[in-house]
Amino acid sequence: MQTLTLLPGRDKAGNPEPFDQIALRRGELCTIVGNTGSGKSRLIKDIEQLSDGTGVTGRRVLLDDGFVPLEQRQAVSTSLVAHLGQNMCFVLDTSVGAFLRLHAACRQKEIRESDVLAVANDITPEPIAMDESLNLLSGGQTRALMIADIALICDSPIVLVDEIENAGIDKQRALSLLQSREKLVLVVTHDPHTALMAERRLVMSGGAVKAVITRSEREAALYDQLSIEYARSQRLQTLLRKGELLA
């Protein structure tokens, strides 16, 4: 898969969405913004399910300019799309190392689990141990581990992420990692800094994609300023977690 194309559906009132098509490519980061209830999660679900126009929104999703046949849709979706939700937990009761070895074997990937763990620990402030139980990991540790797993073990070219800024991890490193592995990354966010990380963002309202905005030069300059503030906030968070004074 090299491109994913969204074809318009309809909003909550039944009106057609105001775009012809939206083409997204591997290696691209695209953010999705809008008020609560604007349709962000529904858009993500349409992409995850490779919607054929029979769903609530009427949207259609093309892969490399073609529809995925109904009988293949479930299998293709499972292999092509990885979804990092806000609340994640493991049902497998085993250690981190055993999980990584098992997943690598299932995917027939020759990779050292220590390399995956090193990547995970680069984006979470609380280190993960190889012999630690999956079920004892915090929410941030879990998402960091899954981001590293998706980047290095999982072959899924499409990654859907819900509000990464709430995960307690370094979002810049996490998203840059996924892009560097040629993933198409779509991030639902309410945060201006996260939204401006992408060259393009989709604006949701009333259940529809109301606008596709390309980041302007002024917004790029604003992003640089917000990145400085983000780095400062990260440093203060580190001091706070260590029990040190902030001023």
Regions found by a protein language model. Name each.
Residues 119-136:
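Conserved ABC nucleotide-binding domain
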Residues 1-26, 55, 71:
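A short, flexible loop at the N-terminus of ABC-type nucleotide-binding domains that lies
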Residues 28, 42-106:
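ABC ATPase nucleotide-binding domain signature region
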Residues 208-239:
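Conserved beta-strand-loop-alpha-helix hinge in the C-terminal portion
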Residues 34-40:
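Walker A (P-loop) phosphate-binding loop of P-loop NTPases
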Residues 196-204:
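Conserved catalytic segment of ABC-fold P-loop ATPases
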Residues 187-190:
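H-loop/switch region of ABC-family ATPase nucleotide-binding domains
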Residues 139-159:
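GG-anchored amphipathic helix commonly corresponding to the ABC/SMC/Rad50 NBD signature/C-loop
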